[in-house]
């Protein structure tokens, strides 16, 4: 039987096949992956260029896989081999020296090389193909001769449409840690209130931008809260927060809408000591899109919670200068989630226990004379994430799987400046600007502005 496969046409083999003459050219595909069983193809003569073989392999076994035998080939014969290796489905990484015979060309004129394969699963796979006299075993000996072609390695990388699925949880974590507040950032200088034992309401707006780990995003948020002053040394209250971010990934993007609520208590000592405790619960709604060869999308919701404990002491001089060392621990939990994309990819992200410590110092000055007292300061902090890794499992409809973990342990620094201004009655305005350095996610800038009304 004579057969022609050309002009991007495809021959779906469903069993062992033998042809007398095979013309294979101009992007034609011989698909040996149409059947789950390993198959053999025997061709008497072979002509053409630009042809593609799609073959099933089990490189780790060094024996199981589709086989092609060619008795004679034209002098200019060359072929491209794409593989679907069993390691794509088992999640097992093929290690060490491996050689799997795929093609035998008796004339020795045929030439083959690997071609990358992405069929919309999880992986982009490029096989390394070598002649038998160039493929070596563990002792350095050739495993075949120049008429044979061996698969020696399967190079896998995450395909373009899977990258956003991996990066989206990283963005959620980055937003969680960027949202960590200190007392002064959230409320300004609490001791700058006009009436120390009077309740009030406050509002704060913040905007920022960050990048890192393949993510670039702008974000903004708004907080509204109520203070209940039990006396001139203690204040408790509650607040609500709404935040939005628009991260960009390689070959994708998302829209994140967060909603959270919290309660807090703050206590002041006679010697400038303060303690601030904040408990917070939130959710994050994700609208995720990819836009490469196999565009995909997913919508899902995650939850998080945190408990922050902050201590500080203000040392004040007669000329208004002050120094304020601070220590803070934030314990948090980012919830687990299972979801399925529009193309049927399933994603499981495990929960994550976070523990972020911060050591900081402020240096500033208070000016208390006049109708509108104010203060200003410089600040610097070192932060460290003590939490470990977060686990993930992905699976595609074609059977490809992926298991990995993301280690969020990190150390970084933050620096900024800010101040408070009492501008009349029982109203105070406060603001600051900051950025971070040295971490996996860099806060390029963030500014905060807030106002406190007492009544």
Placement of each model-derived feature along the sequence:
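Extracellular beta-solenoid/beta-roll
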Residues: 1-72, 76-78, 88-152
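Residues that define the transmembrane beta-barrel architecture of outer-membrane proteins
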Residues: 68, 216-222, 255-259, 301-307, ...
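Residue-level detector of buried hydrophobic side-chain packing
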Residues: 73-74, 102, 203, 325, ...
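Short secondary-structure subsegments characteristic of cysteine-rich extracellular domains
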Residues: 90-109, 217-233, 337, 346-354
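Outer membrane beta-barrel translocator domains of Type V secretion systems
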Residues: 155-323, 432-434, 439, 452
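Solvent-exposed, glycine/polar-rich loop segments of beta-barrel outer-membrane systems
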Residues: 246, 250-253, 284-301, 333-354, ...
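Internal active-site segments that recognize and position negatively charged phosphoryl groups
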Residues: 321-332
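Outer membrane beta-barrel transmembrane domains
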Residues: 348-455
């Amino acid at each position: 039987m004579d057969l022609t496969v050309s002009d991007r046409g495809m021959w779906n083999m469903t069993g062992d096949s033998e042809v007398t003459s095979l013309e294979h050219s101009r992007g034609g595909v011989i698909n040996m992956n149409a059947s789950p069983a390993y198959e053999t193809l025997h061709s008497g003569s072979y002509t053409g260029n630009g042809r593609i073989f799609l073959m099933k392999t089990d490189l780790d076994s060094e024996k199981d896989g589709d086989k092609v035998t060619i008795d004679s080939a034209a002098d200019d014969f060359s072929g491209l081999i794409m593989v679907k290796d069993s390691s794509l489905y088992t999640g097992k990484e093929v290690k060490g020296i491996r050689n799997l015979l795929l093609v035998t060309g008796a004339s020795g004129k045929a030439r083959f090389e690997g071609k990358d394969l992405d069929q919309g699963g999880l992986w982009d796979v490029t096989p390394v193909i070598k002649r038998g006299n160039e493929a070596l075993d563990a002792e350095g000996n050739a495993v075949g001769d120049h008429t044979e072609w061996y698969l020696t390695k399967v190079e896998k990388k995450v395909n373009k449409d899977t990258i956003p699925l991996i990066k989206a949880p990283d963005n959620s974590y980055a937003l969680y840690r960027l949202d960590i507040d200190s007392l002064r950032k959230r409320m300004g200088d609490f001791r700058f209130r006009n009436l120390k034992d009077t309740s009030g309401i406050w509002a704060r707006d913040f905007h920022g931008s960050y990048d890192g780990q393949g993510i670039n995003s702008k974000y903004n948020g708004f907080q509204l809260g109520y203070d209940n002053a039990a006396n001139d040394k203690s204040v408790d209250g509650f607040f609500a927060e709404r935040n939005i971010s628009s991260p960009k990934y390689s070959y994708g993007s998302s829209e994140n809408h967060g909603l959270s609520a919290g309660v807090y208590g703050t206590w002041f000592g006679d010697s400038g000591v303060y303690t601030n405790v904040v408990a917070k619960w939130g959710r994050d709604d994700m609208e995720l899109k990819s836009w490469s060869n196999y565009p995909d999308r997913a919508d899902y919701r995650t939850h998080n919670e945190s408990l922050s404990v902050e201590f500080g002491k203000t040392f004040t001089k007669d000329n208004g200068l002050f120094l304020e060392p601070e220590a803070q621990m934030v314990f948090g939990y980012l919830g687990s989630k299972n979801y399925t994309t529009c193309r049927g990819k399933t994603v499981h992200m495990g929960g994550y226990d976070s523990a972020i410590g911060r050591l900081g110092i402020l240096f500033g000055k208070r000016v208390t004379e006049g109708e509108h007292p104010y203060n200003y300061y410089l600040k610097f902090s070192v932060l460290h994430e003590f939490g470990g890794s977060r686990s993930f499992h992905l699976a595609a409809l074609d059977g490809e799987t992926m298991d990995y973990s993301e280690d969020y342990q990190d150390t970084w620094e933050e620096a900024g400046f800010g101040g408070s201004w009492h501008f009349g009655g029982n109203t105070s305005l406060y603001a600051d600007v900051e950025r971070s350095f040295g971490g996996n996610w860099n806060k390029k800038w963030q500014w905060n502005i807030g106002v406190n009304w007492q009544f």
